[in-house]
């Protein structure tokens, strides 16, 4: 496990470049800071300043090396690097509320932006006019879209929103996509077609995060009522739901076809598995508890406490987890959704942690990634 404290401010979101030498983070404001790995240090090498509202989403395309950002200013920008300088291109989102989330498609020829305008902007590059344009998916979304994830076929798009529902839409754009093959989610995929809908008003909560499995047949999501759910399209859209005893989870991602990692307000990542019988099970918290020791507080810590907690005393508010506040995002660091070897978390404590499954397996008895 390696933990790096970037900031005192929360890290809103992050994204890695292809070779994992650079990470782009938003320090809870209108900027994106890019840090480069230099030995054991992370050195700030770029600041992207074009938004005039809080940045809410970052994604870094591994093949084309382009960054897309979105923010509360209702804008999205595609950033391309030329001669060592990042240049922004404005995207026409056509929304009247804040953008909340952004994600490149697997082929990197389009991206999707969720927003408070109760719609999803699917954006693609129009070469004749040399600009990024968008098409809207509106119905039947009834509230803010909080999270998105692309199916491996580059066409289907999962969305979690504040109306307690998780939906799968077709984001097929004839200008850039080849006609998609049939999937367990359906065969006819005109743009905006809703392929599936899960959840309801009677139960559930805001859907904070969604994730397709590597095959695209399974879809996981976490809600504000502390539930983890998995829908399996290959099993007639059957849904398995696990009501956990934990605080709400904010981020979820598949780390193998049947295992997923989720994290949130409990400040540590957790492993869940989904078996062939359609049963969803909590396996373990993936944290190594710190040894609590009594010690004298240094002058440096006294000043840090004044900044962080508005107090000069050491009241032993330190959590036993590595992260000292809620985890806001989980991402794969080494490997992919078929076989993840390391994953990364960032949180409100301004820290970034890289977790190694091999190290975790040696500490946690009986831990195996299925």
Swiss-Prot record:
InterPro entries: ARPC1, WD40/YVTN_repeat-like_dom_sf, WD40_repeat_dom_sf, WD40_rpt. PROSITE patterns: WD_REPEATS_2, WD_REPEATS_REGION. It is found in: Cytoplasm, Cytoskeleton; Nucleus. GO terms for molecular function: actin filament binding. One of its GO terms (biological process) is Arp2/3 complex-mediated actin nucleation. SMART domains: WD40. GO terms for cellular component: Arp2/3 protein complex; cytoplasm; nucleus; site of double-strand break. Its main location: cytoplasm. Pfam families: WD40. WD repeats lie at residues 6-45, 50-89, 140-179, 202-241, 244-284, 322-365. Keywords: Actin-binding, Cytoplasm, Cytoskeleton, Nucleus, Repeat, WD repeat. Belongs to the WD repeat ARPC1 family. Component of the Arp2/3 complex. Probably functions as a component of the Arp2/3 complex which is involved in regulation of actin polymerization and together with an activating nucleation-promoting factor (NPF) mediates the formation of branched actin networks. In addition to its role in the cytoplasmic cytoskeleton, the Arp2/3 complex also promotes actin polymerization in the nucleus, thereby regulating gene transcription and repair of damaged DNA. PANTHER family: ACTIN-RELATED PROTEIN 2/3 COMPLEX SUBUNIT 1, ACTIN-RELATED PROTEIN 2_3 COMPLEX SUBUNIT 1A. This is Actin-related protein 2/3 complex subunit 1A-B. The lineage of its organism: Eukaryota, Metazoa, Chordata, Craniata, Vertebrata. The gene is arpc1a-b.
């Amino acid at each position: 496990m390696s933990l790096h404290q970037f900031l005192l401010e929360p890290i809103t979101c992050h994204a890695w470049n292809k070779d994992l030498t650079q990470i782009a983070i938003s320090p809870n404001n209108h900027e994106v800071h890019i840090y480069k790995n230099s030995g054991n240090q992370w050195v700030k090498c770029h600041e992207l300043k074009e938004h005039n509202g809080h940045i809410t989403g970052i994604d870094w395309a591994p093949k084309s090396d382009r960054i897309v950002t979105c923010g509360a200013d209702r804008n999205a920008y595609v950033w391309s690097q030329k001669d060592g300088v990042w240049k922004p291109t404005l995207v026409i989102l056509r929304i009247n509320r804040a953008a909340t989330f952004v994600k490149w498609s697997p082929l990197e020829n389009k991206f999707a932006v969720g927003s408070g305008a109760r719609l999803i902007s699917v954006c693609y590059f129009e070469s004749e006019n040399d600009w990024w344009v968008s098409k809207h998916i509106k119905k039947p979304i009834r509230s803010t879209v909080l999270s998105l994830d692309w199916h491996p076929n580059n066409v289907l798009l999962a969305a979690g929103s504040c109306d307690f529902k998780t939906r799968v839409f077709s984001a097929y754009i004839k200008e850039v996509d080849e006609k998609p093959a049939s999937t367990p989610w359906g065969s006819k995929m005109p743009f905006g077609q809703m392929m599936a809908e899960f959840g309801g008003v009677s139960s559930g909560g805001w859907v904070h995060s969604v994730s397709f499995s590597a095959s695209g047949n399974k879809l996981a999501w976490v809600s504000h009522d502390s539930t983890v759910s998995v829908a399996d399209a290959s099993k007639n859209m059957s849904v398995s739901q696990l009501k956990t005893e934990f605080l709400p989870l904010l981020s979820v991602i598949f780390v193998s076809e049947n295992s997923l990692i989720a994290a949130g307000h409990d400040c540590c990542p957790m492993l869940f598995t989904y078996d062939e019988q359609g049963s969803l099970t909590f396996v373990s918290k993936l944290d190594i508890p710190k040894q609590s020791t009594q010690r004298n507080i240094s002058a440096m810590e006294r000043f840090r406490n004044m900044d962080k907690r508005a107090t000069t005393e050491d009241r032993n508010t330190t959590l036993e987890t590595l992260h000292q506040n809620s985890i806001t995002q989980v991402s794969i660091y080494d490997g992919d959704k078929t076989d993840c070897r390391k994953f990364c978390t960032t949180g409100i404590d301004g820290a970034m942690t890289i977790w190694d499954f091999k190290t975790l397996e040696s500490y946690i008895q009986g831990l195996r990634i299925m």
